[in-house]
Regions:
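Short, Lys/Arg-rich, polar N-terminal cytosolic tail immediately upstream
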Residues: 1-5
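A structural signal for multi-pass alpha-helical bundles of membrane permease subunits
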Residues: 6-291
Length: 291
């Protein structure tokens, strides 16, 4: 087979996936960008080109800035906690112990539960006076508290749900990476007198950097795409304390019927995710390949 024939054969193999990617990813993105420069049609009034008016409206929108701030706090809390917990769980269940399979299943179970089911389970835990959390705090003599109804604790309560659900999912990737490591590394470190913590810090964790990069990218995406739990548990309240960017976009587009403004919000979210992804690859790619 000639070089040109191999080149053509390779592109023919890529063509179905490339067509689907263009149809369901690139085309909607370009369509959203185009619509963000138009006004929303009202009644008999057709959409008109308004340029950057939607983006100027966005810059003056206090709810957008609150949702962005909430999302940044949510990401700052859930991403490191879920990754650290996943790594700790993977390191634990990777060792030899009785009931290791059941423990792995217990850790992974929250991941396979439907999002709405998880939200309802935790909604019961947080129910004032009757919820499981209230019963536990009451037994300790602590005062009753409305966890989802208080601005100071509502976002933290949602973060706990996300960490509980995502840590088991990330654990699977870390566990797979740990199982691929040669046991001779640990044996050599033990012979040299290295402590378990030193071996983890200097050998295990650097070898896990490719997995950590993959997990981190997924964790960032998950932190900016939460809608289900908010709809079921708080609906963005109290006083927009739990409104995140994607939920605010959902409300603008489907509750207030302003899809063009929602398109502008979506482009801002895509830009934020793009910058976050570039920063992750730029900083972590060097550590992954030891540059």
């Amino acid at each position: 087979m000639t070089r040109s024939a191999r080149w053509l054969y390779g592109w023919l193999l890529l063509l179905p996936a490339a067509a689907l990617l263009a149809l369901f990813t690139h085309y909607p993105t370009l369509g959203t960008l185009w619509h963000s420069f138009f006004s929303t049609p009202r009644g008999e009034r057709s959409p008109t080109f308004v340029g950057l008016e939607n983006y100027r409206q966005l810059a003056d929108d206090p709810i957008f800035w609150q949702a962005l701030t909430n999302n940044l706090w949510y990401a700052a809390g859930t991403i490191p906690l879920s990754i650290a917990l996943a790594l700790a769980m993977a390191a634990w269940v990777n060792g030899k112990m009785a009931g290791r399979g059941l423990l792995r299943l217990a850790y992974f179970t929250p991941t396979i539960l439907p999002m709405i089911a998880v939200a309802n389970i935790w909604l019961f835990f947080y129910t004032p006076e009757y919820g499981l959390l209230e019963k536990l705090t009451g037994a300790l003599g602590l005062p009753a508290h409305n966890w989802l109804g208080s601005k100071s604790t509502a976002l933290g309560a949602l973060m706990a749900v996300a960490v509980w659900k995502e840590a088991g999912f990330f654990m699977i990737f870390y566990l797979a990476a740990l199982q691929q490591m040669s046991p001779h590394l640990a044996e050599a470190a033990a012979i040299e007198g290295a402590s378990r913590w030193y071996f983890f810090r200097r050998v295990t964790f650097p070898l896990l950097m490719p997995t950590t990069l993959f997990v981190l990218v997924n964790a960032v995406i998950n932190a900016f795409r939460l809608v289900d739990h908010i709809v079921v548990m708080t609906r963005g309240g109290p006083d927009n304390a739990t409104a995140l960017l994607l939920y605010y976009i959902y409300e603008i587009g489907f509750r207030f019927w302003d899809p063009m403004y929602g398109a502008a919000l979506t482009m801002v979210l895509l830009a934020l995710l793009g910058m976050a992804a570039l920063a992750q690859f730029w900083f972590l790619e060097r550590r992954v390949h030891y540059q």
